[in-house]
Amino acid sequence: MKSLKSFIIESAKTKFFETTVGKFFAWYVDFSEDWNDIDAKDAEDVFDSNDVPELNDFSNAKEFVKFINDNKDKKIKVKQEQLPNVYDTSFEVDGKEISLDTVSLFGYDEDGKKLF
């Protein structure tokens, strides 16, 4: 069976992963040799608790694809401020630099207010 990392990277070429959400996941998981190697703290940095599952909530590729499919039409807004992230590297969404720990990645600000 393919590793989840291989599955995601290969799937990045499909329409599923042409969404910004999919590109983010493909980029993030590429830093890990295996899904289980992603540290729980890193997962908490990526997601706010507002109805977005954490990385370690996905036990297999099927659940991951379902999540991407369920969110493929979601517009993502990001903050335009420099924040440190877990890998000390930049990541751009629509030309804007974001950090992995920004809670606005999935549409919420620090206070949990929905942005879109």
Q: Predicted segment positions?
A:
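Intrinsically disordered, low-complexity segments used for protein-protein interactions
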Residues: S6, T19, N60-E63
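A short beta-strand micro-motif
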Residues: K15-T19, A26
